Design a protein with these regions (language model features):
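Phosphate/diphosphate ligand-binding glycine-rich loop within oxidoreductases
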Residues: 4-126
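Glycine-rich phosphate/diphosphate-binding loop of Rossmann-like nucleotide-binding domains
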Residues: 127-135
Length: 135
């Protein structure tokens, strides 16, 4: 039994389908443990046809926030209370934050991460045209 999990441990998660291959639980749980954060991260296989029920379950369980992968990104953007400017522009969200009142805000970090990675590898986008395709 995991000794660091208690009745006070905050749960965070990934939803989408399939998620069994995701490295996110290992990455987040390692980070939580190293930083002494009383939290756990799990991946839940939530097919598109069950995404609404999945988001309702997340609300009911008081999950602290969650990530979204395909095929649920667009559907989740219609189930949150608010969208960040990037999520509105893209029409999908990959990260959902939950405030102290349970309000869900959808964000999309795909575009920012893509551009940051290009910049870190010496690719300057000024005056260039590119298209980000998300499957």
């Amino acid at each position: 039994m995991e000794s660091r999990i208690s009745g006070h441990t905050k749960l965070f998660c990934l939803i989408g389908s399939p998620v069994g291959h995701s490295g996110s639980p290992a990455m987040y749980n390692y980070t939580f443990e190293r930083l002494g954060i009383d939290a756990a991260y799990m991946a839940f296989d939530v097919p598109l046809e069950q995404v609404e029920a999945g988001v309702e379950a997340i609300k009911t369980l008081g999950v602290g926030g969650f990530n979204v992968t395909m095929p649920d990104k667009t559907a989740v953007s219609h189930l949150v209370d608010e969208l960040s400017p990037a999520a509105k522009l893209i029409g999908a969200c990959n990260t959902v934050t939950v405030d102290e009142n349970g309000k869900l805000t959808g964000h999309n970090t795909d575009g920012v991460g893509f551009v940051r990675n290009l910049h870190e590898h010496g690719v300057e986008l000024a005056a260039q045209c590119c298209e980000h395709l998300n499957r």
